[in-house]
């Protein structure tokens, strides 16, 4: 009984390592090589639109409402200690250090990541990738690489937008609704936030999350079983694995950045 359990555990561990190896080789083969900017630039621009611009609506709307909720809950707590003038500090630090990068990455995984997986999986199911290989076109360089760089570029920009509209949403609640003096709100935020460190750390988190989410999304699509059920399972795996990876990496990065 114990030997069977150990054998099963070892089999799963080897399978996981093999999957990581295939994912690493896919990304390496897609990115390493002679750059062809003139040929791939139109593909990159198109994917920036598909991955980034089409994700802006959910990012902006979610950012406004999360900022408003954060402003309202923060106001209710701070008024208990007669510290409601510190609401701007609370909203800005919460969004810059944690909520902005994490929530933007989770929304990006749900919207853009799942779309990338479904698109690549469908291309494999309809043998478009095999057709490219037959025509001496590297599908990794033509299909995977532009989508990867589009994700890496888009998510940090979407995170900045999320944080900006979130702070604006918090000011709507705190200043326009609850009547906090706007000077107190913005000055508390400016005094408490180290824009160089907090903004840089926010961007570092968003870049790490962008690489992770885009990599997982593309590999799950590339490795999907070429059936409708296989593509469906691959899309589900993308959202689940990306969400867990973002939350786990967030703890690691937070411990490294603010653990001292």
UniProtKB/Swiss-Prot annotation:
Null allele phenotype: Mutation leads to accumulation of phospholipid in the outer leaflet of the outer membrane and increased outer membrane permeability. It confers sensitivity to SDS-EDTA.
Keyword set includes Cell wall biogenesis/degradation: no
UniProt keyword list: Cell inner membrane, Cell membrane, Membrane, Transmembrane, Transmembrane helix, Transport
Membrane is among the record's keywords: yes
Main localization (coarse): membrane
One of the GO BP terms on file: intermembrane phospholipid transfer
Pfam families: MlaE
Cytoplasmic domain ranges by topology: 1-50, 110-147, 220-238
An annotated Gene Ontology molecular function: phospholipid transporter activity
PANTHER family membership: ABC TRANSPORTER PERMEASE PROTEIN-RELATED, PROTEIN TRIGALACTOSYLDIACYLGLYCEROL 1, CHLOROPLASTIC
Function: Part of the ABC transporter complex MlaFEDB, which is involved in a phospholipid transport pathway that maintains lipid asymmetry in the outer membrane by retrograde trafficking of phospholipids from the outer membrane to the inner membrane. Probably responsible for the translocation of the substrate across the membrane.
Oligomer and partners: The complex is composed of two ATP-binding proteins (MlaF), two transmembrane proteins (MlaE), two cytoplasmic solute-binding proteins (MlaB) and six periplasmic solute-binding proteins (MlaD).
UniProt cross-references to NCBIfam families, sorted A to Z: MlaE family lipid ABC transporter permease subunit, perm_MlaE_1
Name the record gives this protein: Intermembrane phospholipid transport system permease protein MlaE
Protein's organism: Escherichia coli (strain K12)
